[in-house]
Swiss-Prot record:
Residues 89-148 form a coiled coil. InterPro entries: Hypoxia_induced_domain, RCF1. The keyword Nuclease does not apply. This is Respiratory supercomplex factor 1, mitochondrial. Belongs to the RCF1 family. GO terms for cellular component: mitochondrial membrane. It comes from Blastomyces gilchristii (strain SLH14081) (Blastomyces dermatitidis). GO terms for biological process: mitochondrial respirasome assembly. It is found in: Mitochondrion membrane.
Length: 148
């Protein structure tokens, strides 16, 4: 039976209001807020690569080597931010995966229930048609007996 008033059904995740079905952009913004150091590391690495490219075009080997070292530091910073964020947010990610799994199971169950309801409706229509058809045959046989 569909939820008519569109209020959410009670769930074991009610204690965690941060869990909800989110769009891709909501997920990106949430992840940027959770781990702001990773994009900073990406930006630092990209900037170092851009400066290295400019130095290479200008044939400035000292600046080129300095920017390659800066790129390595940017990579190290980004890797550290990824590992530290993974450790720090590991439990929350586990809870989110459990929530997404439960949500998928709920959606699958709703699809199965809708499919079963559709089959029941079709079965009822088929039985009604057979009853009407049988009643019409009986009426035709009785009319034939009366005439003949």
């Amino acid at each position: 039976m569909p939820n008519i008033d569109n209020t959410p059904l009670p769930s074991s995740f009610d204690a965690h209001p941060e869990f909800f079905q989110e769009t891709k952009w909501q997920k990106v913004t949430r992840r940027l807020k959770e781990e702001p150091l990773i994009p900073i590391g990406y930006a630092a690495t990209s900037y170092a690569l851009w400066r290295a490219y400019k130095s290479m075009k200008a044939r400035d080997s000292v600046e080129l080597n300095r920017m390659f070292r800066a790129r390595i530091y940017g990579h190290a910073f980004t890797l550290f931010a990824i590992v530290a964020g993974g450790i720090y947010y590991g439990q929350e990610r586990k809870q989110r995966k459990e929530f997404e799994k439960a949500l998928q199971e709920k959606q699958d169950q709703e699809k199965r229930d809708a499919w079963l309801r559709e089959l029941e409706v079709r079965d009822k229509e088929d039985k009604d048609w057979r009853q009407r058809h049988a009643a019409m045959e009986m009426a035709a046989k009785e009319a034939e007996k009366k005439m003949g």
